[in-house]
Regions:
Chain A
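Catalytic alpha-helical scaffold of carbohydrate-active enzymes acting on polysaccharides/glycoconjugates
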Residues: 2-198, 223-248, 254-312
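A conserved mid-domain beta-alpha-beta active-site/ligand-binding segment of alpha/beta enzyme cores
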Residues: 201-234
Length: 312, 307
């Protein structure tokens, strides 16, 4: 029986949880997730990047492709300057078809988080066997083109999934799923069998597409939001001892625009200005959580649930 | 004899809502010479990914990726998990802020949340001064197409679940998405509720009449609501904070002209409870608590005060 999405969540309110801590006494883990995407010129099923014209939509195909031709390289200069470990939310076709981009990421040790093959090929309604093959191909691409490093997590292409997604991710060796934005800590997700999968807090708050492209705030507001978010988390963590996670989600075709460079650098400088911040990759955070917190958190939440059932 | 002949299928005014206008009604007097009563209602709704067959769902609602308000395709978790953030983290951050500021709060819970989130109801019951019933789930709403009995059953089920889970009696109601049928106010009164918060219709509580007689509309403003301001209108958070400050300042000034004012702050765990927005709540409540002209009071108490 497939687990429903609501039932994947292992609920426990933040105030009653055992403490989650990060290495070396740091209190807020921050991961940078550049979304390096490819959008098919003509997508299977006829999807378009912006829903603006029928396909092809050269305006937005080119706008996004320019993200990989120029903006990505500008972003790299900011990443390098502040030595920001990055977890690339990657359209995996880039591994095979854009070796220049792939190699630049590999040279910097970026971690690959799957973001599908193309960002116009969502997983919605995909039959089980097809989705199974999709993960198999994803791991083959990483093994073949990225130094044999298998992929540990995914942000669904176009933020999509099916009822089988979590279970198939576990089957193919993945440990974190970024589609869940329901917490400030990783949380266990229920899966069939004994596989361990956690949600890793991705963000549609500190994310250039919702902020700048969809809602039209200026670049400076991205900085304001990032600072407000992380400042508050640092203060809360000082008070309750709970380690927290923030994600800075960028896209080269948005944050790599020339006028955005100063704001991106301001965010990165801020991340490097406070020793309480652990700038890490999604897998660093997940691995630490799995090693140190997962079992305790799951047991504690299950205890609350059992006590409630006994009372009823 | 009126000049306008309304079409037969038009209901021109909301049932149960008396028409009364500032400067044409007796001023509302607040106790101890206060000028502005403020109630904080914290929403802790749950989002049911697959509502039961026959449920009525909103045509559009906030939350998720970007600014798309249509129902997401099944398999997209953004809206579900963003609303859930309110229950895992956001509501507790806002409750902590209110407690530190010494501001009493009401928390609105729904039946799906209290049934499926172990510990949620117990912890809210420990920390909230008032419990409010908020229907079945964030995305299962009341609708004019329901029969009266279906609507009665919806109201009864939600109330029963929330009261049983919290061990508290609820005298107030807030409808998901503020959605009503034309019967809702009357049915809430029939069910024994004293107040409801759906209607952003006034700057003071409104005693309803007709089938809803005995029910008080406690008006939680739309423009001052975090979800409307920060999502629907896309205000930047510093602008939202200024809007709140300026609203308070003007309402206090207006009280000398038109009588005591009410401001209902409708805040969502998944919105203002986000770390990036929470300082707005903290600074606003701290300022309100320090203002001698402001009476901070739960909505249930403000409804009682008005009666």
């Amino acid at each position: 029986m497939t687990i429903q999405n609501n039932d994947r969540l292992v609920y426990e309110a933040m105030p009653t949880r055992p403490l989650v801590t990060w290495p070396e006494g740091r209190t807020v883990a921050v991961w940078h997730a550049p979304n390096v995407e490819h959008y098919d010129y003509i997508a299977p099923g006829g999807g378009t990047p912006q829903g603006r014209t029928r396909y092809p939509d050269p305006q937005h195909y080119m706008h996004r492709d320019n993200g990989n031709r120029t903006a990505f390289w500008r972003m790299l200069r900011a990443v390098d300057r502040f030595e920001i470990p990055s977890t690339v939310s990657l359209s995996l076709s880039v591994l095979e078809e854009m070796p220049e981009v792939r190699d630049a990421m590999a040279e910097r040790g970026w971690e690959i988080m799957s973001h599908g093959i193309s960002n116009l090929r969502p997983l919605y309604d995909m039959p089980y066997d097809d989705e199974d093959r999709f993960y198999e191909l994803s791991q083959q691409l990483a093994e073949t083109y990225y130094g044999g490093r298998r992929i540990k997590g995914m942000l669904g292409p176009k933020v999509s999934g099916t009822d089988n997604t979590s279970d198939l991710m576990v089957k193919h060796g993945m440990t974190y799923h970024a589609d869940w934005i329901h917490d400030e800590q990783p949380r266990p997700l229920r899966t069939e069998g004994d596989g361990r999968l956690v949600s890793i807090p991705y963000s549609f708050m500190l994310n250039d597409v919702p902020l700048l492209l969809a809602k039209h705030y200026p670049g400076s507001y991205f900085v304001d939001m990032a600072k407000a978010q992380i400042d508050r988390m640092l203060r809360d963590a000082d008070e309750d001892g709970q380690g927290r996670v923030a994600c800075i989600a960028t896209h080269p075709f948005v944050s790599g625009q020339p006028y955005m460079q100063r704001y991106l650098e301001e965010i990165f400088a801020y991340l490097r200005s406070d020793d309480r911040i652990w700038v890490a990759t999604a897998a660093d955070i997940t691995d630490h959580y799995l090693e140190n917190s997962y079992d305790e958190q799951l047991a504690h939440a299950n205890g609350i649930s059992a006590a409630r059932e006994a009372r009823a | 004899m009126t000049l306008i002949q309304h079409p037969r299928d038009a209901t021109v005014f909301a049932p149960g809502l008396p028409r009364a206008y500032d400067t044409h009604r007796a001023p509302w007097q607040l106790p101890a010479g206060k000028k502005l009563a403020v109630s904080v209602l914290l929403h802790a709704p749950s989002y049911q990914d697959v509502p039961p067959a026959g449920s009525f769902k909103p045509i559009a609602m906030q939350g998720g990726v970007g600014r798309d308000t249509a129902e997401p395709k099944h398999g997209q978790l953004a809206r579900l998990s963003q609303w859930d953030f309110g229950l895992t983290v956001g509501i507790w951050r806002l409750l902590g802020i209110a407690q530190k500021a010494g501001v009493p709060v009401a928390v609105a819970l729904d039946s799906f949340g209290v049934r499926t989130m172990p510990g949620l109801a117990d912890l809210v019951a420990e920390r909230a001064q008032e419990i409010v019933v908020r229907g079945s789930a964030a995305n299962i709403i009341l609708d004019e197409a329901m029969t009266a009995d279906e609507e009665r059953a919806y109201i009864a089920e939600a109330r029963s679940a929330v009261e049983a889970a919290t061990g508290r009696t609820a005298s107030g109601w807030f409808s998901p998405e503020r959605a009503n049928s034309a019967r809702t106010a009357g049915l809430l009164r029939e069910a024994g509720f004293d107040w409801f918060g759906d209607w952003p219709v006034d700057e003071r509580p409104v005693a309803l009449d007709g089938a809803a007689s005995g029910l008080t509309a406690v008006p939680f403003g739309l423009e001052t609501e975090d979800m409307f301001a920060l999502y629907t209108r896309s205000l930047a958070f510093p602008d939202y904070e200024r809007l709140l400050d300026e609203t308070v300042e003007q309402l206090i000034a207006d009280a000398d002209v038109v009588g005591g004012r009410f401001l209902g702050l409708s805040w969502f765990g998944w919105v203002l409870g986000q770390a990036c927005f929470a300082d707005v709540a903290e600074r606003t409540l701290t300022k309100l608590a320090a203002n001698p002209q402001v009476l901070l009071v739960t909505p249930g108490d403000v409804a009682a005060l008005h009666r």
